[in-house]
UniProtKB/Swiss-Prot annotation:
<dbReference type="Pfam" id="PF00203">
    <property type="entry name" value="Ribosomal_S19"/>
</dbReference>
<protein>
    <recommendedName>
        <fullName>Small ribosomal subunit protein uS19c</fullName>
    </recommendedName>
</protein>
<comment type="function">
    <text>Protein S19 forms a complex with S13 that binds strongly to the 16S ribosomal RNA.</text>
</comment>
<dbReference type="GO" id="GO:0003735">
    <property type="term" value="F:structural constituent of ribosome"/>
</dbReference>
<dbReference type="InterPro" id="IPR023575">
    <property type="entry name" value="Ribosomal_uS19_SF"/>
</dbReference>
<keyword id="KW-0689">Ribosomal protein</keyword>
<keyword id="KW-0687">Ribonucleoprotein</keyword>
<dbReference type="GO" id="GO:0006412">
    <property type="term" value="P:translation"/>
</dbReference>
<keyword id="KW-0699">rRNA-binding</keyword>
<dbReference type="GO" id="GO:0019843">
    <property type="term" value="F:rRNA binding"/>
</dbReference>
<dbReference type="GO" id="GO:0005763">
    <property type="term" value="C:mitochondrial small ribosomal subunit"/>
</dbReference>
<dbReference type="InterPro" id="IPR020934">
    <property type="entry name" value="Ribosomal_uS19_CS"/>
</dbReference>
<dbReference type="InterPro" id="IPR002222">
    <property type="entry name" value="Ribosomal_uS19"/>
</dbReference>
<dbReference type="GO" id="GO:0000028">
    <property type="term" value="P:ribosomal small subunit assembly"/>
</dbReference>
<dbReference type="GO" id="GO:0009507">
    <property type="term" value="C:chloroplast"/>
</dbReference>
<dbReference type="InterPro" id="IPR005732">
    <property type="entry name" value="Ribosomal_uS19_bac-type"/>
</dbReference>
<keyword id="KW-0694">RNA-binding</keyword>
Length: 92
């Protein structure tokens, strides 16, 4: 279910403050965050945000096509390595 249009998009306060500070300085530095639920807003475009996937922080460069999506969508949490091989020869 989509979020109501009456409400604003959710962005963590600490993340919003860091982005505003970097926009006023016009500097580029990697922003580390654990907030996967934050929505990408237009002020984030051009920044690199390191999103936590449960084990490490993955640096993601924010583009204009990502606006409206959540940060967690771009940092996968599980690594699928394929189904287990049916190894009948080793059981004998």
């Amino acid at each position: 279910m989509a979020r109501s249009l009456k409400k604003n998009p959710f962005v963590a306060n600490h993340l919003l403050k860091k982005i505003e500070r970097l926009n006023t300085k016009a500097e580029k530095e990697i922003i580390i965050t654990w907030s996967r639920a934050s929505t990408i807003i237009p002020t984030m475009i051009g920044h690199t945000i390191a999103i936590h996937n449960g084990k490490e922080h993955l640096p993601i460069y924010i583009t204009d096509r990502m606006v409206g999506h959540k940060l967690g969508e771009f940092a996968p949490t599980i690594n699928f390595r394929g189904h287990a091989k049916n190894d009948n020869k080793s059981r004998r």
